[in-house]
Amino acid sequence: MRLFVSVDLPDGLADAVAAVQDRFADADGLRYTDPGQAHVTLQFLGDVPESRADDLGDALESAVRATDVAPFDASFEGLGVFPSLEYISVVWLGVGDGSEELAALHDAVERQFVAEEGFEPEDHDFTPHVTLARMEHAGGKQLVQNVVEREHPEVGTARVEAVRLTESTLTDDGPVYETVRTVRL
């Protein structure tokens, strides 16, 4: 099973996320994420045996309990790309308020899963974000660059009360997500 740890955006922000995606409508080469599945990935675990799901849920519980992060509000605003404006592979919506709490959760999860569960540490700094689209070819690169450099959408604020261990099943119609474990803050 393919797993990741995330914080989900509420359904109430899906329309606002879709409206931000619409700003890139004329850009060729983008494959959009489903706004109804918007989330901030704290740690991508990859393919793991199904037999480990319960243990990984317990590890997530331990990681969250090791922090002093209580429920908090996160604002979703601004745009960015990975890895750079010159070589765009991902277009994302940023996090304003709440980014420190998300970083603390990420750090705790990464420590737990690397030290105790044998996963590899990520090879890049954590930037809390919601993936809006992936660039499959550079046809729309200039438009994406222009929008990212000139616009600063403010999507809204959401109360973050839980972290989820989520299974991602890849299909021809896009990924299907199923919650394996929810850990309340």
Segments the model singles out, each with a brief description of its role:
Residues 1-185:
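Histidine-dependent nucleotide/RNA phosphoesterase domain, centered on the 2H-phosphoesterase fold
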